């Protein structure tokens, strides 16, 4: 909620999901620490930069302990430094939770993904690791593999 502080947003979401008072406090502290939100914990969400807002959004999603996290264009519109910081946060989650990430940035798909799926107009055209997609298309770069899959498959 834009008029709540970072801390209040985290507490609110944890409360909605039925965590008791102590668990709300514990989970809030965990998310503040995990996403380095301590320096902005008393700032209203609407005053945060795009990068901080994305980190808060992910923390709010994770406070509920989901099995799957959907990230739709998580770094769209972020500057290079904010994007790299968010990449580090996402990287740190690998192996702890299943993530499905949509992106138009090939370098993001390359650096963050264990498997990559290429969709065209809602149709799944190819799925595989980076190496598998490059081998499938006979290309050296993901961008070239993507273009070949989109244009020829």
Give the ranges of each region predicted by the language model.
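Conserved ABC ATPase signature
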Residues: 3, 44-48
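Conserved ABC ATPase "signature" region
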Residues: 11, 15, 22-40
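A short, proline-enriched helix->beta-strand linker immediately N-terminal to the Walker B motif
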Residues: 63-67
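Catalytic Walker B motif of ABC-type/P-loop ATPase nucleotide-binding domains
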Residues: 69-72
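Conserved H-loop
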Residues: 96-104
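ABC ATPase "signature
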Residues: 127-128
């Amino acid at each position: 909620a834009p008029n709540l502080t970072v801390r209040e947003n985290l507490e609110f979401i944890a409360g909605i999901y039925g965590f008791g008072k102590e668990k709300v406090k514990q989970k809030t502290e965990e998310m503040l620490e995990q996403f380095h939100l301590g320096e902005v914990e008393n700032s209203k969400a609407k005053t945060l930069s795009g990068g901080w807002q994305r980190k808060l959004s992910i923390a709010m999603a994770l406070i509920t302990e989901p099995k799957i996290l959907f990230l739709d264009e998580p770094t769209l519109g972020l500057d290079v430094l904010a994007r790299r910081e968010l990449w580090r946060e996402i990287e740190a989650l690998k192996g702890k939770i299943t993530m499905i990430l949509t992106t138009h940035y090939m370098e993001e798909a390359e650096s963050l993904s264990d498997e990559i799926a290429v969709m065209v107009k809602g149709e799944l055209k190819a799925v595989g690791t980076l190496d598998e997609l490059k081998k499938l298309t006979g290309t050296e770069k993901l961008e070239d593999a993507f273009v070949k899959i989109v244009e020829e498959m």
